[in-house]
Amino acid sequence: MREGRMFAQKLSYKEVLDSEGREMGVLYNIVVDAKTGILTELVIKPASELDTSGFKKENDYILIPFDAVKSVRDVIVLDSEKIKTRA
């Protein structure tokens, strides 16, 4: 596989942290715009201690805009400023 590419399957169940190191939860799924193919949201199973009141929710999951992703390595890191109160 070429440098800089990753299969979505490898992302499932990766730990998700904010840029300050706080645990957000675990990646459950990814939402893709069917017309454009653009990744739009991460579907995250929130950590039990995470206050989810400021997040857009669907069932037991929080939805995070894909543009909040800072990096993907062993964990997924989100930009703390881009995820604040986006319910």
For the regions a language model picked out, list residue spans one by one.
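Peripheral interaction segments used for macromolecular assembly
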Residues: 1-87
